[in-house]
Design a protein with these regions (language model features):
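Periplasmic c-type cytochrome electron-transfer domains
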Residues: 20-457
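Short intrinsically disordered, low-complexity coil segments enriched in acidic
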Residues: 2, 17-20
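Bacterial N-terminal signal peptides that target proteins for export
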Residues: 1-9
Length: 457
């Protein structure tokens, strides 16, 4: 990757970006100053042109770390430290183009860019899920050739079920059923709890980290219509050694980006770090426990520091066609259907020491970062700290309209079951049941306007 950037070139591009911000309607600036006009497959991996060359290059180094292939110790190419059990060789292996993973469309295809959490009833010492005694916190399908066998293969069987709108139009929803085969380390047991998860896009995460805890607490306490509630998750902060408000992950189980990244390295690639210093091997996995390991911790500052900055500094794509008449009408319908009661259109960041330019920005992520009961149909029946099985964090909607451009698909929700935005809405239940019913009763022209608005984000 070429990194020869001059200060004058960066300054000129920054001036251009600031001019764009000044000339653009504020509602189009999804990430405030950290908004990018990029609309192609690279739209989820942009940042602003920093006035200093050091940070500009650090963002490029961070993407290199994201793409870096991690290998088993003693292999000749790549960074040592992956495994013995893992699900990917690099961050980009699942966060494709800094975006979402994919779900297998056919029942004979094993999962490769998503994961399955596992646990048993009860809580661990920190208040989180109790790891499965044989398989730990998640199923890892990759091992070490000739030494450590991967734990299992996971497949998804799909069942189609029709849903009819009030005007007679029918949509087919697909319901997933996990099938876990080739279990190497013994049976799972009838009390095992499962949660399939698709990787989420890496855009605007620093901006979300910059939103003060007090804002989330105020959103939780605010009165809401139609039985909507919303609550924060209280999770374990491994660095501070105390409970904290969670905001990252499908159930808001990590309080900050440092922990989110280190947890992903540990659980998905078997890479140890200062926060997670031991391998993922369980007591019964003797070959895993006896396997050669790289010097600890495996995730060092040379990889982690630029990667953290990359994730923190990633910008958000600007809205497209925000002033279009039908898009405006769709936005009004979005509010009238109470979608905005959870998908909060606008937040403001506080002081943000990692990137001061992100401080006091008005952003439009369309999330409250709170947990909401989404109904039995979306339940994984697996508690995670204070998040119940039916509760999920409100997914940010910014960048949604470019999902297919970036990743080639629009598989949405925590397990990728929704193939379109319309399907995602129709899976909503629980606190979102009112919104779903309103959508079902809308005339087709109104449904199209609402979807057009969502596609503009």
């Amino acid at each position: 990757m070429i990194k020869q950037l001059s200060i004058s070139a960066i300054a000129a591009t920054l001036s251009s970006a600031l001019a764009f911000a000044a000339d653009t309607e504020s509602e189009s600036l999804s990430g405030g100053l950290f908004t990018t006009t990029m609309r192609d497959a690279a739209a989820y991996r942009q940042t602003i042109p920093f006035p200093d060359e050091k940070r500009q290059l650090q963002h490029l180094d961070g993407f290199d770390s994201l793409a870096q292939k991690w290998v088993m110790p003693l292999l000749p190419t790549g960074v040592w430290g992956r495994g013995p059990l893992s699900n990917a060789e690099s961050c980009l292996g699942c966060h494709i183009n800094s975006g979402r993973g994919t779900v297998p469309a056919k029942s004979n295809e094993p999962i490769r860019t998503m994961l399955v959490r596992v646990s048993v009833p009860g809580k661990n010492a920190n208040g989180g899920p109790m790891p499965h005694p044989r398989y730990g916190d998640q199923i890892n399908f990759m091992g070490v050739e000739h030494e450590v066998r991967g734990e299992a293969e996971v497949f998804i069987d799909w069942r189609e079920k029709p849903v009819q709108f009030a005007d007679g139009e029918t949509v087919s929803l697909r319901e997933p059923k996990l099938r876990i085969e080739q279990l190497v380390y013994g049976p799972l047991g009838d009390d095992t709890l499962f949660s399939p998860r698709v990787t989420q896009p890496l855009l605007g995460l620093g901006l979300l980290e910059a939103v003060p805890d007090s804002t989330l607490e105020a959103l939780s306490a605010a009165p809401k219509p139609h039985g909507i509630k919303g609550k924060t998750n209280r999770v374990w902060d491994f660095a501070a050694k105390r409970m904290a408000i969670g905001r990252f992950g499908h159930k808001a189980t990590n309080p900050n980006l440092s922990q989110q990244i280190m947890a992903a390295f540990h659980d998905d690639m078997g890479v140890t770090s200062n926060l997670f210093p031991t391998e993922t091997c369980t007591d019964v996995q003797k070959s895993c426990r006896n396997a050669f390991s790289a010097p600890q911790p495996e995730l060092g500052p040379n990889q982690f520091v630029p990667l953290l900055f990359y994730v923190q500094a990633n910008a958000v794509p600007a809205r497209r066609n925000a002033g279009d008449v039908d898009v405006k009408r769709g936005e009004k319908l979005f509010t009238e259907a109470a979608c905005a009661a959870c998908h909060t259109p606008e937040l403001k960041t506080g002081e943000y020491a990692p990137i001061p330019e992100m401080s006091h920005q008005v952003i439009r992520p369309f999330t409250d970062l709170l947990l909401h009961d989404m109904g039995e149909a979306l339940s994984d029946n697996r508690p995670d700290f204070e998040a119940g099985g039916r509760e999920w964090r409100t997914a940010p909607l910014w960048g949604l309209g470019l999902a297919k451009t970036v990743n080639g698909h629009t598989d949405l929700l925590h397990d990728g079951r929704a193939r379109t935005t319309a399907e995602a809405i129709l899976w909503h239940g629980g606190e979102a049941n009112f919104s779903r019913e309103v959508f079902l009763k809308m005339p087709k022209a109104d449904r199209q306007a609402l979807l057009l608005f969502l596609d503009s984000l």
